C-alpha cells in the first residue's frame, strides 16, 4: 500500500487558503489531488439536503457544473455519503456511475472502470464528497486507507474554510443568502436556482443582493422568457418577508371588469354572481409580497386603483364601505419599455415612479451566451430525472449549435428545446446505459417567427405600406393582428394551439386579441373590428 510522502502532503496544503475566490481555492485543491492521485477526472461537490452540487471539477464536460445530483437517485453517491471512510468501488461494480459518458474531449460512451469517493466530514457534519474516476481498472488499489483519510481531511478542511468565509460575507450583507460556489445561488431542493456567472448575470445578482433586504418596490424588466418571475421569487426569498406569502398576479390574464374584485376582493352580494365574500390579492399578500406580472398590460383605469393602494397602503373591497390597511411590498414585471409607455400616455407616470424605486434588468440569453453550458447542464439533468434516464449527456456539437442560435424565446425556449431533444434521444437510443443528446435531436431551432406563414407576393406590398404610412405603435398592432389571424387560421381556430405556436399562454393571447379587435365567429372565420 502506497503512502503519501511528506513533500506531497505539504504541496497539497500550501496555498489552499490563499486563493482569491472560492473557485480558485477549489481548483487549487483539485490540482493538488491530481498530483497526489493519478486519475482521469475529479469532482468536488457540496451537500444540501439530499442534493449534491458540483463546486469544481476537472476532466469532465463543463455542463457537469450545471447538474444537480439527488443522492437517493444515484446508488454510488448514496453509498459514499453514508460512509464514514473513503469508498472504493470494484471494477465490476454493477451500480451505475453518475459520470459515465461525461469524460472531457470524448464523444464515446466510455465507462469509468475505477471509482473512488471520499466523504468530507467536519466534526459530525457531512459537508460534501470528493469523487475520483479513472478509465484504468484498479487505478486506486495501491493507495493506503490512511493516505485517503488524510486526503479527505484536507479536502474537508478546505471546503469548511470556504463555506465559513461565505457565511461571514452573508452575515456582513445581512441577507439570508445561502451562497454556493461559482457565484451560483441555490435554495433548498424544492426551491429554485438562478444559473449563471456571466457579467450581465453577476450585475443582476449584485442588484438583487442590494435591494432584496429593503422594503422598496421593484420593477423587473426584460424580454419574454428571461426569468422575471424567478427573479421576483429570489428577491422575496432574500427579504425579511420570506416567511410571509408571495402572491402572483398575471395582470394580462384578468378581464378588465374583474380587476378590482381580483385585486381588492369583494363582499357577498357586491355584484351579480358574488354569492360569497372573497379576499383580493392585496389582502392575501398582507405582510408579504405581491408580484404583479405583465404590469404594462393594465388598462389606465386599473392603474389608478393600484396607485391609490400604493400611496395610502389601503384597499377597499368591492361593495364594502370601510377601507382596510395592508402591508404589501410590490414587485412588478414587464417586457414593455414603461418609460416609452408613459410618454405615449398608455401608462401613468406617477404609478411608474412608485413601482420603479429600484429597477432590475434581466438580460436576454443572447447577452449571456457564456452561461449556455451551465444552463444546458441544468436543464439536461432536469430532463434526465423527469424522463427516468440513467445517464444523459450532450454530444460535443450540441453546445456549439446552441451558442450559434439567437434564442428569441430566451431561457424558457432553451428549456423547452432540451426537453424535446431529450425525449427524442431517449426514444432513439432506448436501452442504452448512456443516452446522448445529439444535434439531430434539436430539430430545427426556430423562434416566434416560426408560427408565421411565408408572405406571398400579394402580402409584401401591404407590409411595405405599414412601414411607410403608420407610426411604430400602429404598425406593431397591425403586424400583431396579421400574425395572430394567420396563426389562428393555421391552428383551426384553436386558441390554445395558436398560443402554443406563438410561444405565449392562452390568456395573454386572448387579451391581446381583444385589444386588437380580433374575434373568431361561430362559423370559424376571423373578424376584425379595427
UniProtKB/Swiss-Prot annotation:
Residue numbers binding ATP: 222-229, 285-294
Function: Involved in the regulation of different processes depending on the cell density. Acts together with sigma-54 to repress, perhaps indirectly, some genes.
InterPro entries referenced in this protein's UniProt entry, alphabetically: AAA+_ATPase (IPR003593), GAF (IPR003018), GAF-like_dom_sf (IPR029016), Homeodomain-like_sf (IPR009057), P-loop_NTPase (IPR027417), Sigma_54_int (IPR002078), Sigma_54_int_dom_ATP-bd_1 (IPR025662), Sigma_54_int_dom_ATP-bd_2 (IPR025943)
Keyword DNA-binding: yes
Xref: CDD domains: AAA (cd00009)
Matches recorded under NCBIfam families: PRK05022.1 (NF003451)
GO molecular function, one term: DNA binding
The keyword Repressor appears for this protein: yes
Domain of life assignment: Bacteria
Source organism of the structure: Vibrio cholerae serotype O1 (strain ATCC 39541 / Classical Ogawa 395 / O395)
Protein name per UniProt: Regulatory protein LuxO
Residue ranges annotated for the Sigma-54 factor interaction domain, each copy included: 194-423
Alphabetical list of Pfam families matching this protein: GAF (PF01590), Sigma54_activat (PF00158)
UniProt GO BP: phosphorelay signal transduction system; regulation of DNA-templated transcription
Record's keyword terms, sorted: ATP-binding, DNA-binding, Nucleotide-binding, Phosphoprotein, Repressor, Transcription, Transcription regulation, Two-component regulatory system
